[in-house]
């Protein structure tokens, strides 16, 4: 196992099956959460489409094995840049992975109770483990081949020689899938050892879930306790890697906190409390939206000061870590409020929701090839990113909708 400084682009969710709706509020809730997961998938596509044109993207590489290895996060680097993409990428990076771990946890407890640990893990191995193997073995080399081409080299043989000599092989966005599978394994083992642990967690969160401010405070301080010590010990951009398994070292416990809190909210009753359509969170969406913007601005200001500060690195590291967790929680609460309050069934959004997992799995290869194809185009960074984003969304959506017509594929993704 090794540790790398690669600032990998963070990514997304399990897309577990939603429970069968039993009443109108449950139907509306399922629509809201399903649409929110699909929306974050779209944010992931926009995030990756913009990275080639990020103002601080690294210089084009000369070899896949050259150090530092920044190409896993930036497979293609364009000469065209736009400063606004630093805001988009920074905003996404503060919250969307954490929110997706929270959403992934919502239905875990009911699934464990219904299936038991064995059947639950078999289902997760099928829905998460198998796609990860395919993504790491097939889709990742396809996505990173343009990085090799940008070095000026040609030919699959040369690419393969450099690829197998790496020692650690990035799986692209699929890193999220294996981490989620690991978290599911933790939940299943706990269920075998302590069968009521989710119910206890649900009872602890039941009252705070009806008071969004209280729940927000719990989320901030629990995640800060998990994140800040790790960020002080490890560089916040550091990734631990072994083989095809990557995870962001300082955030792994932070993500686990969001996942476990999601389990607790799901155990407490997903259609009531925090995520009720007529609840306090949904009714207060304007305040949460404004608070999210303020918290992100505060986190950005602290980050700028912290990276230029010459003194008190632990103080600024602590402040930076706290404002990160503050912004993360505020943005997550804001998007939950907006979707629970306003999401209504639409056929096109239903299609996006149904195909979102597959879109997530295959989009990275499409992004990198479109970025590579546009390298010599006489277009601005904004124009290129827009073409890459819309092209990736359309192509991946069409492709997944087509292959999901095969029943076995539809059961998998």
Where are these regions (language model features)?
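Alpha-helical transmembrane segments and their immediate juxtamembrane cytosolic regions
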Residues: 2-413
């Amino acid at each position: 196992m090794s540790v790398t400084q690669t600032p990998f682009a963070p990514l997304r969710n399990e897309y577990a099956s939603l429970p069968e709706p039993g009443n109108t509020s449950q139907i509306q809730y399922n629509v809201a959460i399903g649409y929110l997961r699909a929306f974050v998938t779209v944010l992931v596509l926009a995030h990756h489409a913009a990275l080639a044109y990020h103002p601080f993207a690294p210089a084009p590489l000369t070899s896949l094995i050259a150090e530092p290895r920044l190409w896993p996060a930036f497979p293609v680097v364009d000469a065209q840049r736009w400063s606004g993409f630093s805001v988009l990428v920074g905003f996404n990076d503060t919250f969307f992975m954490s929110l997706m771990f929270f959403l992934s946890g919502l239905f875990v407890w009911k699934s464990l109770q219904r299936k038991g640990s064995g059947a639950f893990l078999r289902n997760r191995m099928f829905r998460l483990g198998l796609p990860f193997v395919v993504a790491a073995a097939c889709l990742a080399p396809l996505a990173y081949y343009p990085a090799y081409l940008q070095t000026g080299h040609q030919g699959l043989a040369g690419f393969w020689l450099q690829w197998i000599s790496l020692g650690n092989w990035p799986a692209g966005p699929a890193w999220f899938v294996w981490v989620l599978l690991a978290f599911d394994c933790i939940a299943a083992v706990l269920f075998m050892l302590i069968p009521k642990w989710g119910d206890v967690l649900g009872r602890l969160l039941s009252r705070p879930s009806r008071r969004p401010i209280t729940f927000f405070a719990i989320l901030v301080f629990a995640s800060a306790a998990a994140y800040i010590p790790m960020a002080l010990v490890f560089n916040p951009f550091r990734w631990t890697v072994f083989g095809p398994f990557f995870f962001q070292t300082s955030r792994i416990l932070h993500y686990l906190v969001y996942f476990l809190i999601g389990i607790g909210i799901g155990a407490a009753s997903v259609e009531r409390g925090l995520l009720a359509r007529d609840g306090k969170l949904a009714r207060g969406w304007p305040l949460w939206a404004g608070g999210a913007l303020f918290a992100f601005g505060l986190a950005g200001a602290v980050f700028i000061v912290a990276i230029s500060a010459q003194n008190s690195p632990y103080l600024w590291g602590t402040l930076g870590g706290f404002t990160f967790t503050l912004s993360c929680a505020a943005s997550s609460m804001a998007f939950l409020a907006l979707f629970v309050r306003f999401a209504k069934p639409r056929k096109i959004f239903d299609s996006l929701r149904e195909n979102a997992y597959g879109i997530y799995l295959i989009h990275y290869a499409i992004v990198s090839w479109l970025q590579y194809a546009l390298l010599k185009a006489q277009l601005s960074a904004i124009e290129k990113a827009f073409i890459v984003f819309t092209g990736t969304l359309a192509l991946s959506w069409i492709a997944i909708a087509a292959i999901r017509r095969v029943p076995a594929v539809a059961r998998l993704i």
